[in-house]
C-alpha cells in the first residue's frame, strides 16, 4: 500500500511465498541518491540530502547500492513479512548542464520523481514565462489542490499536491528599456497535470534572482 509519489511511505505485506529463500529487490530511485538522471545533463542545486530506510518486520535492511546498481536486496522473505520503505521527499531545485545554453542561470523544481511547473491559470493569469525565482526560494506544500479539466466535457476534477513558492518576481516589459517588477508567490503543479484548462502560459525553467538582467 502506498500514496507514492505524493509521499514516500510504502508498505509491502507478503501474503504468501511459494519460493524458498526468495529475495526482493527494492529500487532506490536516483532522486533519493542525489541523481536527477543517470548522466550529467541535470544536477540538484540545493544542499538537501534525502534519507531513505527499508525495514523488514521493524529490522533495518542495508546494502551497498552501487554494488547492486541502485537496488537494495531484501533476502529470505516469507509469508507474514512486512516490508516498509520510506523516502524523504523534500522540494528540490535542479540546474542543467552549462552546455544547455537556454537553461543557463535557471532552475527547475522537483519533488520526489515529479517535475513541477507554473501554469498561468493557477497564478492569476500572470505571465509565468517571465517569473523569476528568489535567490533562496522556500516552498510550501498544498494538499488536495483541485484541477478541473475544462477541455473534456464531463471530465471530473482531480487533485494533486501543489507547491507554493516564496514571493517570486514577475517581469513586465513596459518600454524598450523599461521594465516593471511585481512580487507574488507562485503556485506550481506537477508537470503531467498542465494543459487541461485552456490555452495559457506554462513554465518549467525559471531564472533565479534578477542579476540575469545585467547580462
Place the predicted regions along the sequence by residue.
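C-terminal beta-rich recognition modules with glycine/proline-rich loops and embedded aromatic residues
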Residues: 1-13, 36-56, 65-72, 86-215
Amino acid at each position: 500500500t502506498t500514496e507514492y509519489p505524493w509521499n514516500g511511505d510504502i508498505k509491502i505485506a507478503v501474503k504468501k511465498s511459494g519460493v524458498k529463500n526468495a529475495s526482493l529487490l527494492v529500487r532506490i530511485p536516483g532522486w533519493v541518491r542525489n541523481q536527477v538522471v543517470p548522466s550529467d545533463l541535470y544536477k540538484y542545486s540545493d544542499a538537501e540530502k534525502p534519507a531513505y530506510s527499508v525495514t523488514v518486520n521493524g529490522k533495518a535492511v542495508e546494502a551497498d547500492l552501487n554494488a547492486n546498481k541502485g537496488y537494495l536486496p531484501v533476502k529470505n522473505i516469507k509469508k507474514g513479512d512486512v516490508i516498509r520503505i520510506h523516502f524523504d521527499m523534500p522540494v528540490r531545485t535542479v540546474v542543467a548542464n552549462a552546455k544547455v545554453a537556454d537553461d543557463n542561470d535557471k532552475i527547475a523544481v522537483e519533488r520526489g520523481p515529479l517535475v513541477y511547473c507554473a501554469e498561468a491559470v493557477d497564478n492569476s493569469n500572470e505571465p509565468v514565462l517571465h517569473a523569476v525565482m528568489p535567490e533562496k526560494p522556500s516552498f510550501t506544500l498544498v494538499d488536495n489542490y483541485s484541477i478541473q479539466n475544462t477541455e473534456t466535457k464531463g471530465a471530473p476534477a482531480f487533485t494533486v499536491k501543489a507547491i507554493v513558492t516564496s514571493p517570486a518576481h514577475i517581469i513586465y516589459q513596459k518600454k524598450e528599456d523599461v521594465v516593471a517588477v511585481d512580487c507574488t508567490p507562485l503556485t506550481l503543479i506537477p508537470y503531467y497535470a498542465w494543459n487541461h484548462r485552456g490555452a495559457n502560459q506554462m513554465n518549467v525553467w525559471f531564472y533565479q534572482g534578477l542579476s540575469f538582467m545585467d547580462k
